[in-house]
Amino acid sequence: MKEMKRRFRLAAVAIVGPIILAGTLGSAQTNPPKEAPPDVPDAIAVPAGLEPVLFAHGSGAQIYTCQAGADGKFAWTLKGPEAELKDRKDKVIGEHSADPTSKLPAWKLKDGSEITGKAAAHVDALDPESVPWLLVNVVSNAGKGQLANVTTIQRVHTHGGQPPDYGCDESHKDAETKSNYSADYYFFAPAK
């Protein structure tokens, strides 16, 4: 009788063990580890109580137009970004552009969620040829996807994107130029 109970326990472990392991692996795939926040200067640190909920690598261009400033001098003025957003597995998840109505920076994901934001703070990039790192406050959310509860964005690890230092004068008024850039975007929402 003892031998039969021992065999039954061994059989149960042999059957149940792989099921438990499969369940554990399955939940690991559906609940990915939380994103770690980037190491940034205090000037663009996110407020307490927020946690990163999404990472995206953006690559594309910063678009500039040649405009006269208040002083009458012409300079390249940022029109907006035009970039593709990819996740850590290099899968395209959305796009980054300027909202056509507000002209504010906008992020739109393939899941239907989208946000617009306004820069709240910046620090110069390590490379003077690169656009600054930013802290962006979200001013509007739409859709029910990953961006639905996002309140803050950090743009970090920028490469390129500054306008050229030539080619903008009165004879080139309203001319447009694109400057290639890439950056990492971290999206933050209230901690759960």
Regions found by a protein language model. Give the residues of each.
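N-terminal targeting leaders of exported, membrane, and organelle-targeted proteins
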Residues: 2-3, 26, 58
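Bacterial N-terminal signal peptides
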Residues: 13-23
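Bacterial Sec-dependent signal peptides at the C-terminal "C-region" and cleavage site
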Residues: 22-32
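Primary mode marks residue(s) on the alpha4-beta5-alpha5 output face of response regulator receiver
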Residues: 31-62, 70-192
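Bacterial N-terminal signal peptides that target proteins for export
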Residues: 2-14
